[in-house]
C-alpha cells in the first residue's frame, strides 16, 4: 500500500527491451540515444569503444550543464571502462559535480572482514577438494564451509549463503554498498529556495546483487527466515491476473532486492514531498 501511494502518478512501460544483454552494450543507448545503439556504434569502426561509451555517459549531464542546470552525477557506470567509475571523464566540465556513492557509507571493517572471509574460504576449499567426493558437499556446506554461526552482525555482513527459497545466513557486502547509498539519499539531499534547475544522474547497483531480505519490511538481517511469511502471502506474486514464478532462492533474492530498492526510493520521494520539491514527471527510473 505504501508503494502505491509513493509511486502514484508514475507510468510503467513494460513493452521495452535493452539494446544488449550486458551493461556495456545496454548503457550507451540508454544514456546517449539512438546514435549509441550497437549498430550505430559499430559504424564508427575507427574509434575505441571506451570513447564512445564515455560520450554516451556525458550526453545528458553535459547538455543540462550547458543549459544552465546545476548537474550532479553519481557513479557513472563503466566510465572510462573502469570497474570503479573514472570521474575524470567529466574533467572538461568543472561545474558538474560527480561522486562515487557505491561503498561510501560502509564501515571500515567491511573490507577487512571480506579479506578474512575469503582467506578462510580458500583454506576450506582446499580441504574440501582433498576429501573424497562423497563428503565434499558436507564440507562445502552451501559455501559456509561449516562456519560457526556465532558471529557479530558486522562479521557476518560479508557474503550471504542462501540455504533454501526462504532462508539465508550472512549478508552480501556488495549489496550493502549499493543499498546504503539508497538509504542515505534523504541525508545527502539538500533543498534550497533558490529556484535553480537541477539534474541528477544516478547509477545504483542494489538490484545487481540479489539477496534474501527479512520480510515483510525487506530489511537487512544476518539470519533470514521468510518461510512462514512467504507461505501466508504467496498471492502477492500475482497482480491483475499476471504471475511471476517464485520457486527458487535466487528468484526470491531478485524480488527482495528490487522491493528493498523501491521502498528506499519511496522514502526519498516522501522526503522530497515533505520539502515541496517533488515532481514525478521529472523522475525517470530505468534499467539497462
Label for each model-derived stretch:
Residues 2-238:
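Active-site-proximal alpha/beta segments of enzymes that process anionic O-linked groups
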Residues 1, 258-288:
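Metal-dependent active-site segment of extracytoplasmic phospho-/sulfohydrolases and closely related
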Residues 244-264:
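Active-site-proximal segments of metal-dependent phosphoesterases and phosphodiesterases across multiple
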Residues 16, 20, 174, 244, ...:
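Residue-level detector of functional hotspots within protein domains
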